[in-house]
Amino acid sequence: MAAGTAARKAAPVLEAPPQQEQLSHTKLSAEDTWNLQQERMYKMHRGHDSMHVEMILIFLCVLVIAQIVLVQWRQRHGRSYNLVTLLQMWVVPLYFTIKLYWWRFLSMWGMFSVITSYILFRATRKPLSGRTPRLVYKWFLLIYKLSYAFGVVGYLAIMFTMCGFNLFFKIKARDSMDFGIVSLFYGLYYGVMGRDFAEICSDYMASTIGFYSVSRLPTRSLSDNICAVCGQKIIVELDEEGLIENTYQLSCNHVFHEFCIRGWCIVGKKQTCPYCKEKVDLKRMISNPWERTHFLYGQILDWLRYLVAWQPVVIGIVQGIIYSLGLE
């Protein structure tokens, strides 16, 4: 009788510690959980200093070699480099989006891809419709302005968070910083995609019309009242104020529709006349300083292009080398 009572009293004592441990894990905050994971990671990698040095050296060597190969490829075969980079820019984020369940980015990516695919389809048709160039340049000019606005808003949100201005609006620093980073990434990513697709459409349309060729002379002569970008007649005179758009004249005396030449130079990254290939003076063509192409913005887009398109490839090569060498 006494032995049975002692056994019943001892049973709860043996089951109590796991229950307390389980409750303690459920009461951990997000910060405590993160600290616990860091402690486990530190214990796992303790004493592997030489191995970590080897992994860092492998990463740096692959990074330098990849940079040299990409630069040489871009200089020798720029067209194929741009096409492969654009394809990776388009596909690589889709993989990470599906893997990490970023449905908001996936919906925006899908909408942008559908509309841009339709625009690209219209731009590559032969014969080219007279309305297609205007449609193409208006779409990509809209993408350019929206991406630029998102980039500026994201940058300002990050700077305001770092300065502590988010406290005036009772916004958590993590929320405002996340908003700034996401907005900045959206602006830069779609800015890169829009500019690259606009360049492809510009080459196809201009060569189809016949007033422009990438490596040869124009196949058609240009009249004084014809736009070399869209091939349509110019109605508004140079000294007149148009209701929808004005007429621009370059330093080579060739005239164009406002939307056509803006899309050609600003969105399509073309710095030459569509007909005679003379260098375009953007400061003379665009008087508003806020609409001028910023070289720093273009460099940031190039950096993001490398980060999104080629950095995952470099990391994949490094992981393959590390796995083949047996480094953990």
UniProtKB/Swiss-Prot annotation:
It holds the Pfam family zf-C3HC4. The chain crosses the membrane at residues 51-71, 83-103, 104-121, 149-169, 180-200. InterPro entries: RNF121/RNF175, Znf_C3HC4_RING-type, Znf_RING, Znf_RING/FYVE/PHD. Keywords: Membrane, Metal-binding, Transmembrane, Transmembrane helix, Zinc, Zinc-finger. A zinc finger (RING-type) spans 227-277. SMART domains: RING. GO terms for biological process: ERAD pathway. The keyword Zinc-finger applies. This is RING finger protein 175. The gene is RNF175.
